């Protein structure tokens, strides 16, 4: 039986791989999403070539509220350590990847929300995961927690004034991104219906923030999507997926 190319861990329906789905389809790659927040079981990792872990409104330490987080972290650790699978973590997925591999995650000094810049570190400028990208990248941020300490052996690839670990890699198989590269024209509107996200947005950017962010994202969408394509192509090239 042929393996599915990509397994996707989702934590809320609206936080899906976004434009990355279009890239996968165009390249003829197959993918399967598992909605962990709905109680869907994690399948056998041997049936997949790669793992993508998306964002969500919960925090990595909320295992009492979301017991499935324990199994998810174990699966991420299995994918990286035992199976050497290509793994991409985005936002919450970035934090889960870090914690699963022995890093530390906690509350950020303040929420980081909006279209903001991250800066590549010296190691990031040399990394094949980030090849072809400028030293400063504008991307969508929407988080209140952060990676406080990257896993042992990880390389920090990008940072911002609020969060020092905006991106990290572990060898040539695992990549974590705190920021969102998967954004589409529908992203801001879809995420704003989640109470926790809407509250963070309004608290950080003020009343009317949803409409303003939607306009700003629309104006920059072409550039944001080109950046996503570079990330996607680099990830495929480096990991061999």
What are the residue ranges of the model-derived segments?
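Cofactor-binding loop segments of dinucleotide-utilizing enzymes, especially the Rossmann-like FAD-
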Residues: 9-11, 36, 92
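Glycine-rich His-Gly loop
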Residues: 10-12, 53-57, 144, 179
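Flexible gly/pro-rich beta->alpha loop and the following alpha-helix that scaffold active-site loops
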Residues: 21-88
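Extreme N-terminal starter segment of soluble prokaryotic enzymes
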Residues: 2-7
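Acyltransferase
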Residues: 183-241
């Amino acid at each position: 039986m042929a393996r599915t190319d990509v397994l996707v861990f989702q934590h809320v329906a609206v936080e899906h791989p976004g434009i990355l789905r279009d890239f996968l389809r165009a390249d003829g790659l197959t993918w399967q999403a598992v909605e962990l927040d709905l109680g869907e079981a994690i399948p056998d990792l041997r049936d997949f070539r790669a793992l993508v872990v998306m964002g969500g409104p919960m925090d990595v330490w909320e295992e009492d509220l979301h017991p499935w987080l324990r199994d998810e972290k174990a699966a991420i650790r299995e994918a990286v350590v035992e199976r050497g699978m290509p793994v991409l973590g985005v936002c919450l997925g970035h934090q889960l990847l870090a914690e699963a591999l022995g890093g530390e995650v906690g509350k950020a000094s303040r929420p980081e929300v909006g279209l903001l810049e991250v800066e590549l570190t010296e190691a990031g400028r040399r990394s094949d995961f980030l090849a072809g990208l400028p030293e400063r990248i504008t991307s969508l941020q929407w988080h209140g927690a952060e990676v406080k300490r990257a896993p042992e052996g990880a390389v920090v690839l990008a940072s911002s004034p609020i969060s020092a670990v905006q991106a990290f890699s572990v060898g040539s198989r695992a990549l974590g991104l705190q920021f969102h590269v998967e954004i589409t024209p529908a992203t801001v509107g879809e995420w704003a219906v989640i109470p926790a996200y809407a509250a963070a947005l309004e608290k950080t950017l003020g009343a009317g923030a949803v409409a303003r962010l939607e306009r700003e994202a629309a104006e920059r969408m072409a550039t944001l999507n080109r950046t996503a394509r570079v990330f996607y192509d680099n990830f495929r090239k480096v990991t061999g997926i």
